Amino acid sequence: MKRLTAVLSKLSGSRLDILFANAGGGDMLPLGAITEEQFDRIFGTNVRGVLFTVQKALPLLSAGSSIILTGSTVSIKGTANFSVYSASKAAVRNFARSWALDLQGRGIRVNVVSPGPIKTPGLGDLVPEEHRQGLYDALAAQVPLGRLGAPGEVGKAVAFLASDAASFINATELFVDGGMAQI
């Protein structure tokens, strides 16, 4: 947050057209083993971090600006041992609903891009290296398209939501998950 504040203070008097609040972090934690520290860290990154990033950027956002938040398919689809992360992403989804109303008089759109299983280092780091391919295969089997997504596919969805082509899209959640959350 300190770095963000420093960057935004340098932009004083400038305008921000697009804010992509891309925060995500979590651990596979069985229900009986979740600690307060783990809960606070995950919610701190995924919920508190997003809230205060958007709040600090508000003075730079003008009519026509777009805020895009990173959600996740797990916010609507149960996932064993991932309840804290899932709950944090459900909170982010609801930020978009509320903030679209909070900002309606300013003409600022707020949307969520919700990736499914995307082949990133963060996904692989959820399990020990010797189990990664098994994780990838198990997740791909749950995706109707039969594969994991690529980071660039999420980036294209974000670019769309930020563009004028999405000028009448607000408070929506766009799933980039090969259909996983929809069936």
Where are these regions (language model features)?
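Substrate-binding pocket helix/loop in short-chain dehydrogenase/reductase
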Residues: 30-31, 35-43, 135, 139
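Active-site helix of classical SDR
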Residues: 54, 88, 96
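Alpha-helical segment proximal to the catalytic Tyr-Lys
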Residues: 59-60, 101-102, 167
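Residue(s) in the substrate-gating loop at a strand-loop-helix junction
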Residues: 72
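Short C-terminal tail/terminal secondary-structure segment
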Residues: 77, 158-159, 170-183
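Short, flexible catalytic-loop segment of classical short-chain dehydrogenase/reductase
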Residues: 93, 110, 115-125
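Short, small/polar-rich loop/turn modules that mediate ligand/substrate recognition or access, typified
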Residues: 104, 109, 169-171
